[in-house]
A protein has these predicted regions:
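Acidic, glycine-rich loop-and-strand cores that form catalytic or ligand-binding grooves
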Residues: 216-222
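Membrane-helix and juxtamembrane interface regions of eukaryotic multi-pass membrane proteins
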Residues: 2-208, 213, 228, 232, ...
Length: 381
């Protein structure tokens, strides 16, 4: 295990430079600042009391580091969420016009980028927490230089939630609408709000743990997505497919660990000794409960769906025909399998038909040429 001095040296070497925050904020504002400011102005004009209340609440609750962290304007955050939801609706409505995209190159870059970013954030938070002298749980969001380093990583983790919205865009462009579920949209929007709140009120302390664990899970998740895109078929893809539900279970375990953290802080630690915001810990606990319920439901449904597909593949009953008459499902030697009929049953029916035709031909005294013709006709059905 690293000593505090060793951790300090490594943390200082990999620290996010302050100029990254200012330069990235200036770049993003140059692209979207005008629209975001217009949204805030409309809120201020139409809802002056609510706007004033939020501004007063922020001044009273903001952590000292919050003034140094960009993209914490609540109205800009709300505008971002509305833009995200609007984009989902727009891409869903325009699917006929836009067509279907493969998005392979975009997906490779996106998943590899988030894989590397998650690795950096997970290791950075772990080492920086050690350098700051943190214990596992019950840590305060202080104002020391070591904790400013952690605050920047928490802010980077918060901003990465916006980058993850590209997951949804890629799914919609590929027309994988089944993946854009209520769970998917709920998770991507609410986690952004939760980490905006943590970055504003307490960017450090206990927030380091859930950000570190989540980033660690995302290292494997986005790495898995990247490799599956790199190998869309073959042995590697077959091996990776076996780990699909392991990723989901890993996500659920992180929710359990976060629940344990908040339970420890709120129940085990005496309230007068609690070093972090009790309100944020309560929000964390109930949010994790909601995600556990939704992810658990998702896991059960998808396991049942996969089980049905395996059963259908084994029995041959998975094939269907659509309204245009195109058949899809299991095929054997080019034979189209009808609904509810296995390949063996189909072969038996064909043999029975041939036998019946032979019997009729023998009865009527037909020749070998007609017999062969009828056999060929029966065999082609």
């Amino acid at each position: 295990m690293l000593t505090v001095e060793q951790a300090e040296q490594i943390a200082a070497a990999i620290e996010v430079p302050d100029w990254v925050l200012t330069k990235s904020a200036a770049l993003v504002y140059s692209c979207f600042g005008t629209a975001a400011d217009a949204f805030e102005s409309s809120i201020k004009i139409n809802f002056p009391a609510q706007h004033a209340f939020v501004e007063a609440w922020m001044r009273a609750r903001s952590h000292p580091f919050a003034v140094r962290l960009p993209y914490l304007n609540p109205w800009h955050g709300i505008a971002s969420i509305l833009a995200y939801l609007s984009l989902i609706v727009t891409l869903r409505l325009l699917y006929r016009v836009l067509g279907k995209f493969s998005c392979r190159t975009l997906g490779l870059v996106h998943n590899l980028g988030l894989h590397l970013l998650s690795l950096y954030m997970s290791l950075g938070l772990m080492i920086s927490a050690r350098a700051a002298g943190y214990s596992l749980w019950n840590n305060a969001a202080g104002t020391s230089p070591a904790e400013w380093r952690i605050a920047k990583l928490i802010w980077l983790f918060y901003v990465s939630k916006v980058v993850e919205w590209l997951d949804t865009v890629i799914m919609l462009l590929k027309q994988n609408y089944r993946q854009v579920t209520f769970l998917h949209v709920y998770h991507h929007t609410t986690v952004f709000v939760l980490w905006w709140l943590a970055s504003l009120v307490a960017p450090g302390g206990e927030s380091y743990y859930s950000a570190m664990v989540n980033s660690g899970v995302h290292v494997f998740m986005y790495g898995y997505y990247f490799v599956t895109l790199l190998f869309p078929s073959g042995i590697v893809r077959d091996v990776l497919s076996k780990f699909k539900f392991v990723i989901t279970k890993g996500q659920m375990w992180q929710f359990v660990f976060n629940c344990l953290q908040s339970t420890y802080d709120l129940v085990w630690v005496p309230r007068e000794e609690l070093k972090y915001s009790a309100v944020l810990l309560q929000i964390l606990f109930w949010y994790m409960i909601s995600l556990l319920a939704l992810f658990g439901n998702f896991l059960v449904k998808n396991k049942n769906f996969s089980h049905r597909r395996r059963v259908d593949a084994a029995t041959g009953s998975g094939a269907k025909e659509d309204t245009a008459g195109r058949s899809y499902g299991d095929r054997t030697h080019g034979t189209r399998v009808k609904v509810g009929i296995t390949n063996m049953q189909l072969e038996t029916l064909k043999n029975e038909k041939v036998a019946e035709l032979k019997r009729l031909m023998h009865k009527n005294g037909n020749g070998n040429g007609q017999k062969a013709s009828l056999e060929a006709t029966a065999g082609s059905r």
